[in-house]
């Protein structure tokens, strides 16, 4: 049930942002991107922008990708004042056009992510952009971080 409310909150944020914004999704970076591999994605990432807007100071989402197990753990407080964690598996697929797709599933039979994402890595693997592939125009910017803060 907690996951339902989290997904509902994310959907409401996305719908609100989409409804009040007349802008097209943020363009993908012009600088040369690097191959999106399990090794390149491995490690800790912090969401810094959603739909072109910076995250509110008290709101956060961190995700830690494990290249060996193809698993992730995500910590966020998007729909709660307390940290929640979500786990699951992810896959990376290179498309015929040379782009990369990131898709995933949640643990405990919750199901698949709401959409797949085109992923671009740049800035020597320190920056990452996700853009939804299902037409919903979701755009998320991440930066690599050394570690994820401890949440109590």
List the predicted regions and their residue ranges.
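Bacterial N-terminal signal peptides that target proteins for export
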Residues: 1-9
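Bacterial signal peptide processing site
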Residues: 23-25
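Edge beta-strand at a domain terminus
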Residues: 30, 85-95, 127-152
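Short, solvent-exposed loop/hinge segments that bridge or flank secondary-structure elements
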Residues: 41-71, 105-113
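N-terminal glycine/threonine-rich, aromatic-flanked beta-hairpin/loop signature
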Residues: 55-101
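An anionic, turn-rich surface loop/hairpin at beta-sheet edges
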Residues: 98-120
